[in-house]
Amino acid sequence: LVPHMRREYGGCAGNIAYSLHLLGGKPLVMATVGQDHAPYTDRMRQKGLLTDHVTVIPDAFTAQAFITTDLDDNQITAFHPGAMSSSHRNHIADAEDVSLGIVAPDGRDGMIQHAREFHEAGIPFVFDPGQGLPMFDREELLSFIKLAEYAAMNEYEAKMLEEKTGQTL
């Protein structure tokens, strides 16, 4: 029996864009959502975020995490990537007036593609691998580092990056 349940709106693109918006920025959200997207995209618009480059994948659900926390604060997380796995359908060239990009946790192929597209377009970007870091091998991570102008990660992720690449930060 699960006595309490609540929906939280999250996702890397939405969270980053909302935070930048609160700081006075004009972020452009590029993401993929599923057939169940309406409450999420409505909320983004209500918060002042543009959704012009949020692509709906009609045969998928929006990525979702279900987190169960016991009375001792231990957590089990089940994650379904859903539409996020189609992030490679979005292309940087479809967006205008981009001066800085962020490659944050997303579908594996999409992250690789978007880093390459930012670089080819001459748009500097932040590589923020977050929980997506384990998806990549040494060569892929070295490529991200080479292409990116900036990197953002916590101490745990930085240590994992050093271990996977054999490089120090």
Regions found by a protein language model. Name each.
Residues 42-56, 60, 68-169:
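Ribokinase/PfkB-type carbohydrate-kinase core domain
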Residues 9, 33, 107:
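Charged, low-complexity surface patches
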Residues 32-33, 63-68:
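Catalytic-core segment of enzymes that process non-peptidic bonds
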